[in-house]
C-alpha cells in the first residue's frame, strides 16, 4: 500500500466499479437464462447485437472494439456462430485477411427472438426505478467508458 487515500470522487468511483463488476456477473447469468432456449448465451447475444446494430458488416476487430472486448474472444464466438449458421464471413475489399462479419437469416431471427424476450424482461426489471435516474446512470457509464477508451 502506498498510504495514499482516495478522494471522495475516487472512493465513489471505486464503489461504482465494484457495483458494476457485481452487476456484470448477474447480468450475464440472467442473460444466459433468458436466451438459453434459443441456443444462445449472453456472449453470443452480445456479439449478435454488435453485428445487428453496426451500420454495415464489420471486421471482428472493429466489433470487438465497439464492445470493449478483445479480438480473440470475439473471434472465437464468431467462429462458433459461423459453424452454427448464425453469421457469415464476407471478403473485405480493404483487408484481405480481416473478413467482414454479417448475420445470416438464421442469425437475424435469433437476434430478433432474443430482443422479443428482452423487452418484457427489461420492462419488468425497470419497474420502481425513476426514468431520470436510469438515464443519468447510463450517461455516467457511457462517459466513464469513453474516458477509459481514451486512456488506453
What is each model feature region?
Residues 135-152:
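Exposed, interaction-prone assembly regions rather than primary DNA-binding/catalytic cores
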Residues 2-4, 28, 79-139:
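Charged, amphipathic alpha-helical coiled-coil/dimerization segments
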Residues 25-70:
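N-terminal helix-turn-helix DNA-binding core of bacterial DNA-binding proteins
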Residues 1-38, 132:
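N-terminal leader segment of winged-helix/HTH proteins
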Residues 20, 48-51, 141:
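Hydrophobic structural patches
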Residues 17, 21, 25, 68, ...:
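Short amphipathic alpha-helical segments with heptad-repeat character
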